[in-house]
Amino acid sequence: MIDAKTKVLGLLAHPIGHSLSPLIQNTLATVCGENVAYLPFEVKNPDELGAAIRGAHALGIAGFNVTVPYKEAVIPHLLGLGEEARLIGAVNTLVRTEEGYVGHNTDLAGMATMLARKNLRTEGAHILLLGAGGAARSAAMLAATGGAAELVILNRNTARAEALAKAVRDINPSLTVRAAALEYWRELPGNDYLCIQCTSVGMWPNAEESIVEDPRFFEKLSAAADIVYTPEETKFLRLARAAGKPVAGGLAMLISQGAHAFSLWTGKRCTAEQEEELLTLVKGALPA
């Protein structure tokens, strides 16, 4: 029950109607016995983002999740950044201090959980990223810090892929990193790439789209993961599964990164069993 002691949290995004974060965070609050109310706050005009954050701080709002299109745009309006946010160059969680909000990033932890649930490991792996946006930065830094043998970044905008490759080299100069256009997949040697699809292609309502559909692409993979979680299994993952490859969907990443954010706000960390229960609950809320 909301009262004068309720801690208000929220989500900053545009658009916002599709988000599962209110369901996840309010369920976590119930499970963990926290007096929390988590609400969506849509900022339609990017020019008003700074004003929204200043107003939220003045009102005492305890924290936010941040998603598209504000994960990088929010940074100039913050008091500081946590280590992973600095590493990735993007923010998905704000934690209030008396002086302002500090930005954190729980995407890396969520992505690691998504892979670990399917026994997929970055150590010694040849990792192939599709995309070069915020989610791809998280995946790239996971490769850079997680012992990968090689990282290949493919993106329609090759300049963004090259910029991300440079950022990875700055973090881990010994890692072999290549960046190229999406079509470069045809030139890839071998068939042991752990591919992480990091774009929004295939997200509901465009669930019949896949960033790559050629069966020869999937022959080059050892496994496939997709950050998209609506639908639970994207067309990209269906094609990978049809090629006999293990797959990992983005819903586990969403749940895990949400749980890590909740811990930053409240100090409460849910158990692995509670995360599994939450995963089952959220599956029921996905679009048909």
Where are these regions (language model features)?
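Residues at the starts of beta-strands that form the adenosine-phosphate
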Residues: 8, 126, 149-150, 176, ...
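NAD(P)-binding Rossmann-fold cofactor-contacting core
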Residues: 146-172
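Phosphate/diphosphate ligand-binding glycine-rich loop within oxidoreductases
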Residues: 2-120
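Rossmann-like adenosine-cofactor binding region
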Residues: 174-247
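Adenosine-phosphate binding glycine-rich loop
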Residues: 227-288
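Conserved S-adenosyl-L-methionine
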Residues: 145-150, 242-246
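Glycine-rich adenosine-cofactor-binding loop
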Residues: 13, 105, 116, 124-145, ...
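Short helix-loop-beta connector
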Residues: 97, 120-126, 218-220
